[in-house]
Structures are given as structure tokens and as C-alpha cells.
């Protein structure tokens, strides 16, 4: 077992995220709904109040949701119309095409949701992926995922890669517009340590293609074939899969080698 896995410890219960159904009866985690809301705010709904956002959620994402819940989620995200900031302290940087030639130049980060059928609730998996060597550098599993969790996990990822001065190495973090990544605490941390944080435009998941591909593999290899009874069971399964993904599974994009073997080979020259 790697050091990454030895350091994991089951953290017990945390606040439970809820969900809403869509018109097909599929359960949509509140975290995903929050992402939908933030994408709307970044686009056509910038000047809308919560009731128009509620209407868009029903029309665009086919959610069965009531206005009170949309109000509550908007209030939690600090984006009710009176709460919205006119001037952003950390201006948004739009993701652009880059030529990546080495590890630790560009990391992608995103959140994936998993369902625990035995407890009828969702858990969160936040992961940082190196675009060059494709390793999952570090990750967070929890029943909740905040901007502070994203910061803590990023700090651990920097330590794992022995990056003491991100500004000197020119590290770029690329994310979508999820609430964790537009939070003040995340933007402030990136600014303080010298990381350039860029965000993909709304409805362009191809700009975060590598971590989206990882999420599809995770879904196919693990989540879609598992029915978790407890959070502890889901937690253990994800930790085991992450070890497998980095250290055992071969990848066609890197000469059919395991990711960690490829990364260590690059380090050795």
C-alpha cells in the first residue's frame, strides 16, 4: 500500500448532502445542482434572481425542484441577487490551449459524485490530475466538499510533488466553475502561493478532458458496478480503486504503462 493510502483514515459522519429528482426519476446530488446554478450565474442568469434560476433548472436540467430549495442553495452559495459581488477581487482567467511538455505544468481538478444506496445519500470525490503524466496526485473523499477541502487537498498535492514554490515552477490549476473553485478561500490560496488558477468556460467539459476521462473510467470500473451500503464501504472502495488506477492499471496514452511507473521513469530521465 502506498503512503498516499496509508495516510487515509475514515473520518466518520459529516453533514449529509441532499438531492432532487429529475423527470426521469434520477437522483441529482445537491452538489451537482450547485454546479448547475454557478454555471447559469456565469452565463445567461447573471442578472437573475433565485426564482428565474429555479425556472431555468427545471427547463434546462429537467429537475423536479421547488423555489424554496433553489433559494436555500443560492443563499448557501452567497449568490442571492443582493449578495452578488459587483467587483471580483480575483479576476477570472479563462482556460486556453497549452502545450504541456512536463509534469507539474498543468493540473486539472474536478468533483465526482457517488451514491450510497444503503444510506440514500451521496459522497464527493475531488481529485487533482497531472495532465502530462496523468497521475491522480491527491484527492478528497467526503460527505461534504468545500473550498477549504479543495485547498487542503491542493496543499497535500504540492507536498507530494515536492513543490515548495509553485510560482517558480509555473504551475497552473484548471477547474470548472464549481462552488469549491470559485470560493474566496480557494482563490486566495492560489493567489498567495503563486498558482495560476484558470477556469473553463461554461458548457466546455472538453477543456478539462483528462479528468473528465478519468471520471468516465472510474464510473465504468467502480461506481457503476458497485452498490454501496455504507459510507465506510464506499470510502474503502474508492481508496482501493485510486491505488489501482495510479499503480496497477495500464494506460494506452503512456505506452501501456501504469501511471506511477511512467511518472517515476520521467523523473529518472
Descriptions of predicted regions:
Residues 2-106, 204, 260-264:
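Basic, flexible linker segments flanking DNA-binding modules
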Residues 62, 99-101, 118, 204-207, ...:
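Conserved, non-catalytic sequence blocks in retroelement Pol enzymes and Pol-derived host proteins
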Residues 86, 172-175, 191-210, 227-231:
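RNase H-like polynucleotidyl transferase catalytic core
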Residues 105, 135, 147, 151-158, ...:
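Retroviral integrase
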Residues 105-137, 145:
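An active-site-proximal beta-strand-loop segment
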Residues 121, 139-164:
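Active-site beta-loop-alpha junctions of metal-dependent nucleic acid enzymes
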Residues 165-182, 205, 257-260:
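Acidic/histidine-rich, metal-coordinating catalytic segments
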Residues 191-195, 216-269:
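C-terminal domain-tail junction helix/linker
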Amino acid at each position: 500500500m502506498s503512503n498516499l493510502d496509508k495516510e487515509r483514515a475514515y473520518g466518520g459522519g459529516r453533514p449529509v448532502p441532499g438531492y432532487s429528482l429529475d423527470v426521469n426519476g434520477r437522483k441529482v446530488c445537491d452538489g451537482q445542482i450547485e454546479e448547475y446554478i454557478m454555471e447559469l450565474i456565469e452565463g445567461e442568469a447573471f442578472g437573475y434572481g433565485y426564482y428565474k434560476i429555479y425556472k431555468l433548472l427545471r427547463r434546462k436540467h429537467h429537475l423536479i425542484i421547488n423555489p424554496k430549495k433553489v433559494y436555500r442553495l443560492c443563499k448557501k452559495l452567497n449568490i442571492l441577487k443582493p449578495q452578488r459581488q459587483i467587483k471580483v477581487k480575483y479576476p477570472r482567467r479563462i482556460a486556453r490551449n497549452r502545450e504541456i511538455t512536463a509534469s507539474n505544468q498543468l493540473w486539472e481538478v474536478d468533483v465526482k459524485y457517488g451514491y450510497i444506496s444503503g444510506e440514500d445519500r451521496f459522497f464527493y470525490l475531488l481529485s487533482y490530475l497531472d495532465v502530462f503524466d496523468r497521475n491522480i496526485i491527491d484527492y478528497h473523499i467526503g460527505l461534504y466538499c468545500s473550498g477549504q477541502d479543495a485547498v487542503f487537498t491542493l496543499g497535500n498535492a504540492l507536498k507530494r510533488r515536492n513543490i515548495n514554490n509553485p510560482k517558480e515552477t509555473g504551475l497552473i490549476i484548471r477547474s470548472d466553475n464549481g462552488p469549491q473553485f470559485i470560493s474566496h478561500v480557494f482563490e486566495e490560496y492560489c493567489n498567495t502561493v503563486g498558482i495560476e488558477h484558470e477556469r473553463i468556460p461554461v458548457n466546455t467539459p472538453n477543456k478539462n478532458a483528462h479528468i473528465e476521462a478519468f471520471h468516465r473510467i472510474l464510473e465504468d470500473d467502480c461506481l457503476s458496478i458497485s452498490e454501496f451500503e455504507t459510507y465506510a464501504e464506499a470510502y474503502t472502495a474508492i481508496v482501493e480503486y485510486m491505488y489501482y488506477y495510479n499503480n496497477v492499471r495500464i494506460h494506452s496514452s503512456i505506452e501501456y504503462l501504469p501511471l506511477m511507473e511512467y511518472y517515476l521513469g520521467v523523473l529518472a530521465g
